[in-house]
Amino acid sequence: MLKINFLTIFPKYFDCFLKESIIGKAIERKKISINVIDFREFSENKHKKVDDSVYGGGQGMLLQVQPIAKALKTLKGLKILVSPQGKLFNQEIAKEIVKNHSEITFVSGRYEGFDERILNYIDIELSIGDYILTGGELPSMVMADSIIRLWEDVIKKESYENESFENNLLDYPQYTRPRVFEGFEVPEILLNGNHKEIEKWRKQKQIEKTKINRPDLYERFKNEK
């Protein structure tokens, strides 16, 4: 079973995530378990305060090391700090995590970030992109979703093997009914029943789309051919 812990001061953010179809079903089938932890409960301040002003001056409030460190000491497995300073998360990292870990903790921040000493209790810092969000809860859920999908028997293996980023290529174009909509038609090759030709067309479209939209992936694809 895969165990995922979310450390946050806003636990209600995760309510919908826990009920989402694939994740909710995986929980019901006992393929995964998810634990949302309010690290305010680990504060030694009588008012359960978890933030304070910045030494040396600066804007805003900083999350204190004490409550987060205390919470992390109760947990096992890989401990991830969700941070804009972190390594950029991608499909390869998701695969490595699934391969090597069965318990994962995401620490979500707020305000102006964390006391730097929190890094002494963390295994890796991860980011989902070069932009700033209000807090770490959304990135935590994004990364957890990606990891959960790869866990054994959560979804069929063939369902994700042909998705974007597998083999360093984006997904191919897909169509459903109606055959014609406002003058836009489904490519004829998809209707002729020739599966070899369809497979060849799809691979070509993957390459074309990747070259245009993600030249970095396209270069990796070329180098691995």
Curated annotation (Swiss-Prot):
Source species of the chain: Mycoplasmopsis pulmonis (strain UAB CTIP)
Top EC category: transferase
Xref: HAMAP family: TrmD
Subcellular location per the Swiss-Prot or TrEMBL entry: Cytoplasm
GO CC annotation, single: cytosol
GO biological process, one term: tRNA N1-guanine methylation
Official protein name in the record: tRNA (guanine-N(1)-)-methyltransferase
EC number(s) recorded for this UniProt protein: 2.1.1.228
Designated gene of the protein: trmD
Annotated S-adenosyl-L-methionine binding sites: G109, I128, G129, D130, Y131, I132, L133
Position of the signal peptide: none
InterPro entries linked: Alpha/beta_knot_MTases, tRNA_m1G_MeTrfase_C_sf, tRNA_m1G_MeTrfase_TrmD, tRNA_m1G_MTases_N, tRNA_MeTrfase_TRMD/TRM10
A Pfam family it matches: tRNA_m1G_MT
Catalytic activity: guanosine(37) in tRNA + S-adenosyl-L-methionine = N(1)-methylguanosine(37) in tRNA + S-adenosyl-L-homocysteine + H(+)
Keywords of the record: Cytoplasm, Methyltransferase, S-adenosyl-L-methionine, Transferase, tRNA processing
